[in-house]
């Protein structure tokens, strides 16, 4: 139970609430996800990469694109400055990497463990989501810049974005 009533005050278990928020995002229950992660962002001065990413997904669903971009940029900077990269796992199979590139897994919520163990993939997911947001906002130059980052050319959404950009900018 994530909310316990004690002496007419509520005590919220934030770990359980975070896990519930991940489930809400992955089931596209955006109203519930948004309120969950907004609460967690408000109650935590130090926001984790996973929290920032998940809140950015909620902002994207709410069409609050500038807020989503700001959170993703913060998460990207935090990823660069943490020791998370020292815990990087090797990907066991090229097939799993190919699946990552061709899927929309980057639109799913992140757990803290996923960030801690897969920093390079998380960085790629942040960049892919940023690209999608800049495409929606028709920020073609930034979208092209993002698409040129390492491994982005292998991603299905990036390939599709480049085709769209070409059609929009050559007419």
Regions inferred by a protein language model and the residue ranges of each:
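Alpha-helical segment of the N-proximal tetratricopeptide repeat
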Residues: 11-43, 129
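Structural signature of alpha-solenoid helical repeat junctions
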Residues: 12-13, 47, 115-118, 122
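"A position-specific structural signal for the A-helix of alpha-solenoid helical repeats
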Residues: 15, 19, 54, 122-132, ...
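Alpha-helical junction/boundary sensor with strong preference for TPR arrays
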Residues: 44-45, 78-86, 153-157
């Amino acid at each position: 139970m994530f909310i316990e009533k004690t002496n007419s005050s509520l005590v919220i278990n934030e770990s359980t609430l975070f896990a519930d928020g991940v489930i809400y995002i992955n089931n596209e229950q955006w109203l519930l996800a948004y309120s969950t992660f907004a609460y967690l962002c408000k109650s935590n001065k130090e926001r984790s990469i996973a929290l920032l990413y998940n809140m950015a997904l909620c902002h994207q669903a709410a069409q609050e694109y500038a807020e989503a971009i700001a959170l993703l940029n913060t998460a990207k900077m935090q990823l660069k400055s943490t020791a998370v990269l020292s815990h990087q796992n090797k990907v066991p199979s090229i097939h799993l990497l190919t699946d990552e590139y061709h899927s929309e897994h980057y639109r799913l919520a992140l757990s803290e463990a996923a960030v801690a163990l897969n920093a390079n993939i998380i960085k790629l997911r942040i960049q892919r989501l940023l690209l999608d947001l800049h495409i929606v906002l028709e920020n073609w130059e930034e979208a092209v810049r993002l698409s040129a980052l390492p491994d982005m050319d292998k991603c299905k959404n990036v390939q599709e974005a480049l085709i769209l950009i070409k059609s929009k900018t050559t007419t």
